[in-house]
């Protein structure tokens, strides 16, 4: 295993994060929101990995303020996805756009440079001096174990399916830290494909959330009926996709990453 400079890894992650936030404050396009959230997920996975080298793993938890910024961006992303699929419903789209505008203003208020700088300083002071190969192996195996536990359930919930996706993503994010060549491992490629399918499942779940009564009750009768039908269709599609994912990836054995 190559020697890992933990400070350099985290410093580079925060550098990218600052650039993402700076761009997002100016323009909350769907691509920029996605890039920012991906960078946060990578940082969180890295910190979780490094924390296993410490006596108190809580020292490297993602700070609350950074979580708040991440969630604010996520709430914008959800509406962007929903709007891209429901443009023909005029009243509904107008409602979502109004909410999205409020959420974008909230994001700009909390996405302050000082928050990122203070967060980085706090984390840099608590990083472990070195990272061992067995730490990466243990991190990965714990993620896989949780996946297998969920997969063994008769009917995994939507939340549990999302946990599988997050675990697979975490494995992918940290795998390159241990060995850059491992990112080409066929198992990792299969994991990426699985996360795409699980991402589609989560997108359907999110869409259904924004079609619940609390979001459409104030819409006119004709359009509301169409939205109710759309919710039914997407619920059926979600359930069918979940079954297909489970059947196509029995046991999620493909997630076993080579130690070579």
Map each language-model feature to its residues.
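Function-determining surface determinants
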Residues: 1-260
């Amino acid at each position: 295993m190559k020697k890992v400079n933990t400070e350099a890894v985290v410093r580079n992650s925060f550098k990218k994060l600052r650039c993402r936030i700076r761009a997002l404050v100016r323009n909350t396009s769907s691509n920029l929101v996605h890039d920012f959230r991906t960078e946060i997920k990578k940082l969180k996975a890295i910190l979780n990995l490094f924390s296993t080298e410490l006596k108190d793993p809580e020292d490297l938890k993602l700070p609350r303020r950074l979580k708040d910024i991440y969630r604010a961006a996520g709430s914008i992303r959800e509406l962007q996805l929903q709007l891209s699929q429901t443009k023909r419903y005029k009243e509904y789209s107008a409602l979502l756009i109004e909410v999205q505008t409020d959420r974008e203003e909230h994001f700009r208020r909390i996405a302050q440079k000082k928050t990122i700088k203070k967060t980085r300083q706090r984390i840099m002071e608590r990083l472990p001096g070195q990272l061992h190969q067995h730490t990466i192996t243990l991190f990965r195996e714990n993620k896989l174990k949780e996946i297998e536990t969920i997969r063994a359930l008769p009917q995994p919930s939507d939340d549990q399916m999302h946990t599988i996706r997050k675990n697979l993503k975490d494995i992918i994010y940290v795998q390159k830290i241990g060995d850059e060549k491992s990112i080409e491992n066929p198992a990792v490629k299969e994991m990426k494909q699985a996360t795409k399918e699980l991402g589609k499942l989560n997108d359907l779940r999110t869409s259904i959330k924004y079609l619940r009564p609390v979001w459409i009750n104030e819409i006119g009768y004709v359009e509301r009926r169409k939205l109710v039908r759309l919710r039914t269709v997407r619920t059926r599609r979600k359930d069918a996709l979940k079954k297909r994912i489970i059947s196509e990836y029995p046991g999620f054995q493909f997630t076993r990453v080579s130690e070579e």
